[in-house]
Amino acid sequence: MYTPHFSKIHNRFLLNGYFYSRDELKQVAYDFIKEGDQYEYFLGDFLLDWLDQSDSIYLKSSNNESENEKILFDKQSLVNSAISTGNFFGVSVGDSALHCLPANYIAGKMMLIRAMILGLEIDLISPSKNPFYKNQKTYDFVAMTPTQAFHSLSELRKVRKLIVGGAYVSAALQKALLNAKVNAFETYGMMETLSHIAVR
């Protein structure tokens, strides 16, 4: 079975509605760093690391107690993780996705890697408590923190598949998601496992 290489960008990948070649994506990253908002700065910084010639990358956990602790990972391992996620959740080429997580942590980085590798059409927005505030679009695949999911309950009908992780999902939130008939999955993982290792 063919496995994409980390150096390749899927030809169906769209970023905010536009396709970019590898070199064009580097320019987008530079623009994010130079002129973008804070969340775009982190996205640009990650993209430059991902698109460089190295086959490895340093990552920081979403819930790491030590802000300065980073671990070096093989980029192809991240690709394999993205493919596993796509296979498990049935995320496929051309699906729409929303990036609403901070890109300075692994969860936000993985969402962008999934889009580039799986060929998703991903929209980037500033991380906030309610990512669907003033956003009327629908999405096939979204990853959120429990706080975001809680504040977006009335809007989650716009999401075909939702994964919630990065922090404890309370019983109250679990019940609310069930009552709202949201196709949601609680994920558990850590930096060392490259995103989630358990789902329910």
Give the positions of each predicted feature.
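Gly/Ser/Thr-rich phosphate-binding loop
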Residues: L153-R200
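Generic structural signal for well-ordered alpha-helical scaffold segments
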Residues: L47-L48, I83-N87, A149, L153
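Conserved pre-ATP/AMP-binding loop-to-beta segment of ANL
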Residues: E40-L59, V93-S96
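Conserved ATP-dependent adenylate/AMP-binding module captured primarily in the ANL superfamily
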Residues: M1-K34, V79-L101, S128-D140
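Conserved AMP-binding A3 loop
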Residues: D55-I83, G90-S92
